[in-house]
A protein has these predicted regions:
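Conserved N-terminal phosphate-binding loop of PLP-dependent enzymes in the Aspartate aminotransferase
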Residues: 1-407
Length: 407
């Protein structure tokens, strides 16, 4: 890439840069734009709210309405707390679980992503046992004691995770999982998640679904609806704000009492100047009401087209002996350069990183843009003819790699 791309405008399935180049957008704002860029209900709601004012510091009726919509979407949710990002949401959720249980350790799964605060930037050590991973910090500036003493890693899609929870139940405040991992998007997780819910109940350990990415995208009710599982805590972000900054902590009254101190529950400190921001509330209400009303049309379409992209690209790679595979969970997808079977992030090799980098440069040349993390999304605005163009661009980019000698 000769220089960084800067976006000037967006409309439906497209982004346009400062030079006037138009791209099919597979970023979707890193996931929030479920119905496309500049969704009309959101644009109208924002315009209306701006006329009334855009920051008050005092709660308004819009907070109650958005909270009610989120509650209605999930039987696991009794109460809701708003913040400004998915990272803030997971940070507050970890704190709430520790306060309620009096226990210190929070468990995450290998390959997961839960934000940018210190307790989330913990990963499985690459050289550790796959079925019993040890923890290390991700990036500098995070005390080692966090990964060693306050966090633990569990193996993803591995039943030994259940035994580790049983072994450490007296120290475990919370088990956190992306029900569909962003690094490994797939939907065949029912059996593993059912087992996880059962063992957490057995061991009296709180279970949290991090639905920052999947909430209101996999289904209107997120992965909770798709798998019919009720966690104790849920975090939301992205789509819940209609493209405006948002984080949401939600869950059972027992856990959420830690935010209010009700029923003599230990109370955590939580707050923020922009929590429940009027523009975010307006956008969130508009998009959730739209998604709720049209869910029987929107979500089957997103699954159908996401599956079509993955199926056609995987068939092309197999028939042309290309070591790559498209993994997808409905409308979220990740092209992984590996011909091996993938069960967890441990199976993803980075040996073809240079090939992967060149691929996305070629894809950009075919006017399709994917975020730098290579987790791609489509929206309801990506109609079948747009999806056809996406598939064609992927195929042409693979052919470009072969011509360049990378494959």
């Amino acid at each position: 890439m000769p220089h960084q791309i800067y976006i000037e405008s967006a409309e439906g399935p497209y982004l346009t840069d400062l030079d006037g180049n138009q791209y099919i957008d597979l970023t979707c704002g890193f996931g929030p734009n479920v119905v496309g860029n500049r969704a009309q209900p959101v644009e109208e709601a924002l315009a209306s709210q701006i006329k009334k004012g855009w920051h008050f510091g005092i709660p308004g009726a819009e907070q109650a309405r958005l909270a009610e919509l989120i509650k209605e979407s999930s039987p696991a949710v009794d109460e809701v707390m708003f913040c400004n990002s998915g990272s803030e949401a997971t940070m507050f959720a970890f704190r709430a679980a520790r306060a309620l249980t009096g226990k210190r350790v929070v468990a995450l799964f290998d390959g997961s992503y839960h934000g940018i605060h210190d307790y989330a930037l913990v990963k499985a050590s690459n050289k550790s046992d796959r079925s019993e991973p040890t923890s290390s910090t991700l990036g500098a500036g995070i005390p080692e004691e966090i990964s060693k003493d306050l966090m633990m890693m569990l193996p993803y899609r591995d039943e030994n995770a259940y035994e580790l929870i049983r072994k450490h139940k007296d120290d475990l405040a919370l088990v956190v999982i992306e029900p569909v991992q962003s690094s490994n998007p797939r939907l065949d997780n029912q059996q593993f998640l059912d087992g996880l819910r059962a063992v957490c109940t057995e061991c009296d350990v709180l279970l949290m679904f991090d639905e920052v990415i999947t909430g209101f995208r996999i289904e209107y009710g997120g992965c909770q609806q798709y798998y019919n599982i009720e966690p104790d805590l849920v975090t939301y972000g992205k789509a819940a704000g209609g493209g405006m900054p948002i984080g949401v902590v939600a869950g059972s009254k027992r856990v959420m009492n830690t935010f209010s101190g009700a029923d003599d529950t230990p109370t955590i400190f939580a707050g923020g100047t922009f929590n429940g921001h009027p523009l975010t509330m307006a956008a969130g209400i508009a998009i959730l009401e739209h998604l709720k009303k049209n869910q029987e049309e929107i979500y089957p379409y997103l699954h159908e087209q996401g599956n079509r992209i993955a199926s056609e690209i995987n068939e092309f790679c197999t028939s042309n002996n290309i070591p790559a595979q498209m993994m997808n969970a409905g409308s979220m997808m990740h092209l992984i350069f590996s011909g091996e079977e993938i069960q967890s992030s441990r199976d993803i090799s980075h040996s073809l990183y240079k090939v992967e980098k060149e691929f996305y440069l070629h894809l950009l040349g075919h006017n399709v843009i994917v975020p730098g993390i290579h987790l791609a999304f489509i929206s309801y605005a990506h109609k079948p003819e747009i999806v056809d163009q996406v598939i064609d661009a992927f195929k042409k980019s693979f052919e470009d790699l072969r011509e360049d000698g990378y494959l």
